[in-house]
A protein has these predicted regions:
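Conserved acidic donor-binding segment of nucleotide-sugar-dependent glycosyltransferases
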Residues: 289-297, 304-310
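Nucleotide-activated donor-binding/catalytic signature segment of Leloir-type glycosyltransferases, i.e.
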Residues: 215-241
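Donor nucleotide-sugar binding/catalytic pocket of nucleotide-sugar-dependent glycosyltransferases
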Residues: 114-153
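Glycosyltransferase donor-sugar binding loop
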Residues: 202-216, 233
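Conserved donor-binding/catalytic core segment of Leloir-type glycosyltransferases
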Residues: 168-184, 190-193, 204
């Protein structure tokens, strides 16, 4: 079977999924963006399934968005007419940045839910949330994000990592990892941390700049509180492993979220996770951390709880969760979704 992923982004999720699919007998072509009409016609004989991931980049194009959105709708219709089977993984219910175009985003998602041959979500709560907003007659499969164990080097132990980062062995260190953007809740976290943390606590915040305003305010917070250590930009793998090895817990203080690869990264490296009770968080984390009611009070309580907790059982639970997230199993289950769509079992 031959499948095309679109759009493809520079993150490990799609590469790891493609590897799992390859071992399940599926050949994956990676399309960086919206395919042309010519590509759709030329490849129909050899490609059975178009697997859509993050839809935003297929129909949004700054000032050209009206034309890009129309092109997306035309290609979507053409793909249906040509007989491609269409699968969508709903990584989120709505994009993290709506750019004032909520009706457009909702229309695209209603279209996908109505016409895709299959939809994949990463947890049961995500399925309920998606179907409540966009009812759908066809199948909606639950397939989790796979483990990221082994993705980063594992050569540094806790003591070595802390020494290289200039961190005290006695400090309580939290880590937030991933794109720096408004939906991540990092400004709330910085404020709550500054107001409640002990003198030797440290908050590591690392990730790419995806919102200049958020980064500017975080820089100000870090300048005012030296316990907040901010790394803005690309984080090399060797540095990621130091952060993961040095941290006592991963904090994912989202304002809104469905599912999170950064949470799975933390679990994969044995870190207890602190996250709000939103989307898939409770299902992803299980006994491997603290899930809190969204808001300042809930976050403050969760930070206190994770610091005081016996984190060894949480760390063991995190690794056990990740061990059950095999990409071979996820590839096999995803291939079954494709085959059901192609066989008309939808």
């Amino acid at each position: 079977m031959n499948v095309a992923f679109l759009p493809v982004y520079a993150n490990p999720y799609q590469q790891l999924l493609a590897g799992g699919l390859a071992r399940a007998g599926v050949v994956v072509t990676l399309l960086p963006g919206l395919p042309s009409a010519a590509w759709l016609r030329a490849n129909r004989a050899t490609t059975e399934v178009l697997h859509f991931h993050w839809l935003y980049g297929l129909y949004m194009a700054q000032w050209r968005t009206p034309w890009q959105a129309m092109a997306f709708l035309r290609r979507f219709r053409l793909a249906r007419e040509l007989g491609y089977r269409l699968v969508w993984t709903a990584h989120n219910v709505m994009p993290h940045r709506t750019a004032g175009l909520g009706p457009l985003h909702a229309h695209v998602r209603r279209l996908m839910m109505a016409e895709a041959d299959a939809v994949i979500v990463h947890c049961e709560a995500g399925r309920r949330e998606l179907l409540a907003r966009y009812p759908r007659p066809g199948p909606t499969a639950v397939i989790p994000i796979g483990s990221y164990a082994g993705l980063y080097p594992g050569t540094a132990d806790r003591a070595t990592a802390r020494a290289q980062l200039g961190l005290s062995g006695a400090a309580f260190v939290t880590l937030t990892l991933g794109n720096i953007a408004a939906y991540k809740g990092l400004e709330r976290f910085a404020a709550v941390f500054s107001a409640t943390a002990a003198a030797d606590d440290v908050a590591l915040i690392a990730g790419r700049d995806r919102d200049a305003g958020v980064v500017r305010r975080l820089r100000r917070a870090a300048a005012d509180d030296p316990r907040i250590r901010l790394h803005v930009g690309y984080v090399p793998d060797d540095t990621v492993q130091l952060y993961l090895a040095a941290a006592d817990a991963l904090v994912a203080p989202f304002e809104r979220i469905l599912t999170s690869s950064s949470v799975v990264v933390g679990l994969s490296y044995g870190l207890p996770v602190v996250a709000p009770a939103l989307g898939c968080m409770a299902e992803q984390i299980g006994a491997a951390g603290v899930v809190y009611p969204p808001g300042d009070e809930g976050l403050a309580g969760a930070l206190a709880a994770i610091k005081q907790a016996d984190r060894a059982p949480m760390s063991a639970a995190a690794r056990a969760i990740a061990a059950n997230l095999s990409w071979d199993d996820i590839g096999r289950r995803t291939a079954e979704v494709y085959r059901a769509a192609v066989d008309g079992a939808t």
